[in-house]
A protein has these predicted regions:
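Active/binding-pocket-proximal capping segment
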Residues: 200-211, 357-387, 422-423, 435-437
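Short coil/turn motif common to extracellular beta-sandwich-like domains
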Residues: 40-44, 177-180, 346-349, 456-463
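C-terminal outer-membrane/trafficking sorting elements
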Residues: 443-524
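Histidine-centered copper-binding motifs that mark active-site loops
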Residues: 1-234, 255, 264-320, 392, ...
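C-terminal substrate/ligand-recognition segments
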Residues: 314-373, 390-412
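Edge beta-strands of extracellular beta-sandwich domains
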Residues: 257-261, 430-433, 516-523
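Short, surface-exposed ligand- or partner-binding patches at beta-edge/loop junctions that are enriched
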Residues: 97-102, 238-254, 409-421
Length: 524
């Protein structure tokens, strides 16, 4: 769907995944899964979620940078027979995002039954590249799930399934033209991690992570996709008309700590620890105006400088259990809808250290932001993982460092961070945070601050003063790009000239002896 207002009706259906076998499902505007929503950065998205289910639901816009009141977490319930009007500015770069239910203790069951759909965001940077983007022609959604079907056709909520579905279809195939094509991969499974690659070793050229374009395509024969993660890959099928390729998941290559391996202690499945087919690609004739050349560069997006971080938080994952059950905690805490676990300042940059002391890998998701993976146990992540993300798989015994900026306020409704194994999430491996707007300019506050800035907001010149000697001041835009650097040489005061900069927020960092202070400066 590409329109001004999206109407998403969530309902109960009877659907046949296999001929003659009826299965009760939940779907969005149809029996299983929902429409792909096409949005453009800078536009205003308007959505109406209508609940025709016999139970409460909610809808989360996974990966989208939206205020807390529009995020659709477990607090934002939509009762049976009710609806929810959603409105937000599309603030994400071009990429693949998705929507799914998020009611507490019902997320896994509703997602299992079929409530989910993709969101594709386009922007000027992506549109300037020669990439496949004809939806359903050379640009394809690929939602990968596993589901368990009982003899009576029912589809229970389970950590693992024995049937693989792609876009809701078992034994799926896809007709692709003999040219460069684009696959938008999404792991929509409850718990299984897919280790994707082609049976014949065909290379995939990764162009995005969860949150937008990489700097350049990354060529690989394997791509590990954990729950909620997305990657866009290009395949060069030029000259292969009439051939077919088989996309596989190489479960035999998964570590014992990763759901989907052959770990015999956990729940069993016929697919665990084996290599199994996911999707057959049948190569057809090229289109009249094919993309035939792989790009060499994509985007200049980069992580924020670590020096901009105002705080480092440590999140320790603990507990033991099964893939579908157990008691797993974050910093010794479990979800309580009445407890706010963290408070952040709007516009601030933070580093999170996530250490996994539990017995299995957890795909960790943070609402409302994109982050960059700085390192895994001190080692830089693989190239395809160096773009913006919102889900990261943290293996047992591993510490992953992330950097992120909180760009939207809570607006009265907390954001979540949690394990995206949906059964762990429902079992309360989830905490809440709020993002508070910073007050930037009352004379009383400025006078009381150890380092004062005035006027703030400013029409051009902002003056700063400290009681202690200062070394330097730097000014950055909100993406972390350095704009101004001034050596202060022990002075206790100085000024920044923002007259040449466009209106908006900026980050000023003042460094003294053994300490530093970061403030948001508003240019009017």
């Amino acid at each position: 769907l590409e329109q001004d207002t999206f109407q998403l009706t969530v309902g109960q259906y009877v659907h046949q995944f296999y001929p003659g076998v009826n299965t009760t499902t939940f779907g969005v505007n149809g029996p299983y899964l929902g429409p792909t929503l096409l949005m453009h950065r800078g536009d205003t998205a308007r959505l109406k979620v209508i609940n025709e289910l016999p139970q409460v639901t909610s809808m989360h816009w996974h990966g989208m940078h939206v205020p807390g009141d529009m995020d659709g977490g477990p607090q934002r319930e939509v009762q049976p027979g009710a609806d929810w009007d959603v409105k937000f500015q599309v603030d994400n770069p071009a990429g693949t995002y998705w929507y799914h239910p998020h009611p507490h203790m019902l997320t896994a069951s509703q997602a299992t039954k079929g409530i989910a759909g993709m969101i594709i965001v386009r922007d000027a940077e992506e549109e300037a590249l020669d990439l496949p983007r004809a939806y359903g022609v050379d640009d394809f959604p690929v939602v990968v799930q596993d589901r368990r079907f009982l003899a009576n056709g029912s589809m229970p909520t389970a950590p693992y399934g024995d049937s693989v579905l792609v876009n809701g279809t078992p034994h799926a195939y896809l007709d692709c033209p003999a040219q460069v094509v684009r696959l938008r991969l999404l792991n929509g499974a409850n718990a299984r991690v897919f280790d994707l690659g082609f049976e014949n070793g065909t290379e995939m050229h990764v162009i995005t992570g969860d949150g937008g374009l990489l700097n350049a395509p990354v060529t690989t024969e394997r791509l590990r996709l954990s729950n909620g993660e997305r990657y866009e890959v290009l395949l060069d099928l030029s000259g292969l008309e009439g051939d077919s390729l088989l996309l596989m998941s190489f479960g035999s290559e998964l570590p014992q700590t990763v759901p989907g391996s052959n770990n015999l202690v956990w729940e069993s499945s016929a697919l665990n620890g084996i290599d199994f087919p996911v999707l057959r690609i049948r190569v057809t004739a090229p289109t009249p105006e094919p993309v035939t050349v792989l790009p060499t560069t994509l985007s200049a997006a980069a992580p924020w400088e670590e020096a901009l971080s105002v705080r480092t938080r440590t999140k320790i994952l603990t507990g033991n259990g099964m893939v579908g059950m157990g008691m797993f905690m974050i910093n010794g805490q479990m979800f309580d809808i009445d407890v706010i676990n963290d408070t952040m300042q709007l516009g601030s940059v933070e580093i999170w250290n996530i250490s996994n002391n539990s017995n299995m890998a957890h795909p960790m998701h943070i609402h409302g932001v994109s982050f960059f993976v700085l390192d895994r146990n001190g080692v830089p992540p693989p190239l395809w993982e160096q773009g913006a993300k919102d889900v990261v798989l943290v293996d047992a015994g591993e510490t992953v460092r992330l950097i992120m900026r909180f760009g939207h306020p809570t607006a009265g409704w907390p954001y979540m961070y949690h394990c995206h194994n949906l059964l762990h999430e429902d079992n309360m491996m989830m905490l809440q945070f709020i993002v508070e707007e910073m007050t930037v300019g009352t004379p009383e506050q400025l006078a009381a601050a150890p380092i004062s800035f005035h006027p703030n907001p400013t029409a051009g010149i902002v003056v700063f003063q400290s009681t202690d000697p200062l070394k330097e001041v730097t000014l950055h835009d909100m993406s972390g790009r350095l704009l101004i650097r001034i050596d202060l040489l022990g002075s206790t005061q100085g000024s920044l000239d923002l007259d040449h900069l466009p209106p908006g927020p900026y980050l000023a960092r003042i460094t003294g002896k053994g300490s530093s202070t970061v403030r948001i400066i508003m240019r009017e």
